[in-house]
């Protein structure tokens, strides 16, 4: 949710909302233009989540975000320079290469995809909804150091342990 210019909620969602705001997209406006009518919640096994929306003009569209490799497995199309094209191995390799470049810069990368629907899904399960997607882009986020990390490192050093790398 966005209140007085501040995103409130899960850190990943806040980062995406803040980025969209920087691109000139207002969540408060979009929430009325794209009313959420259903979702397939995030699942760590699928590494993605999907929301389904009804537009002001009555169209139904789904948006899916998640791990790039998992999203790409479900994409049959890609949006390139505003044009929807069939997904092929060259496009897939280019996307995965850019994903690697971003990950090599210590960014946490999410892929975004969409699909226009003829009607609201009968069931909101991943097999029925998360298929035939159109890849629309990647976004990389910096994962800030958690507040408990510095004290944990100090505690390790005090105990004679030399931390080398902390992940996850």
Residue ranges and their predicted role:
Residues 1-135, 141, 151-155, 159-168:
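Cytosolic catalytic regions of ATP/NTP-dependent phosphoryl-transfer enzymes
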């Amino acid at each position: 949710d966005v209140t007085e210019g501040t995103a409130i909620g899960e850190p990943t969602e806040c980062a995406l909302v803040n980025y969209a705001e920087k691109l000139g997209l207002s969540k408060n406006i979009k929430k009325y233009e794209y009313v959420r009518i259903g979702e397939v919640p995030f699942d760590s096994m699928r590494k993605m989540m999907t929301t389904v929306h009804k537009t002001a003009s009555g169209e139904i569209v789904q948006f899916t975000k998640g791990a790039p490799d998992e999203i790409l497995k479900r994409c049959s199309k890609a949006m390139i320079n505003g044009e929807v094209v069939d997904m092929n191995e060259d496009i897939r390799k280019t996307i995965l290469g850019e994903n690697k470049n971003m990950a090599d810069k210590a960014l946490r990368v999410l892929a975004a995809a969409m699909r226009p629907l003829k009607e609201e899904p009968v069931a909101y399960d991943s097999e029925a909804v998360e298929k035939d997607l159109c890849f629309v882009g990647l976004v990389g986020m910096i994962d800030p150091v958690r507040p408990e990390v510095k004290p944990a490192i100090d505690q390790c050093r005090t105990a004679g342990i030399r931390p080398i790398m902390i992940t996850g």
